[in-house]
Amino acid sequence: MEFLGSNIISINQFKKDDVELIFETANKLIPFANRSKLTKVLDGAILSNMFFEPSTRTRISFGSAFNILGGSVRETTEMDSTSLKKGESLYDTSRVLSGYSDIIVMRHPLAGSVEEFANASRVPVINGGDGDNEHPSQALLDLYTIKKELESRGKTIDNARVALIGDLKYGRAVHSLCKILN
């Protein structure tokens, strides 16, 4: 997968090699996350967080990561604060917002809505959760954590048994995690 300029809509986009590259990159970024190294690699770049459903961890983690790498973050956390409330289409909202952003992370209550938004965007869009459909970034984080925990015990993720507990029918993160575990 070519990452530069690409949307992240579904965990199905990633092959095993892609996931391994993401994890290698994540490992290289740990010193920046821990603040033992500083960088301004994203200086001048703007992330727009568009979260139309409640979020603490996803919204804050994307924003914090972008800030740590030197970028700026714009937050929209309520649909009522946008022209969508007045009937503007996702297409039009996407066209406008992508003119002011370098990348957009979006969470929306309707399955498929983030993909619709991304199709109209002029900048990359990351799915931060769309209804009960998918949450690819959470699945990648969960898999990364499982892998690191197993490795700390001298084991690998190959042939590991993973138990999933919680809302298995409507939990978008679980849906994405099940796909990537296969």
State where each predicted segment sits.
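Alpha-helical scaffold segments in soluble metabolic enzymes
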Residues: 21-28, 96, 116, 141-148, ...
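Active-site-adjacent beta-strand anchor residues
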Residues: 12, 107, 167
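Positively charged, low-complexity intrinsically disordered leader regions
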Residues: 1-60
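Glycine-rich phosphate/diphosphate-binding loop of Rossmann-like nucleotide-binding domains
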Residues: 52-64, 148-182
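A generic local structural motif
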Residues: 33-37, 90-93, 175
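Phosphate/diphosphate ligand-binding glycine-rich loop within oxidoreductases
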Residues: 41-147
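Glycine-rich nucleotide phosphate-binding loop and flanking beta-alpha elements
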Residues: 30, 111-112, 171
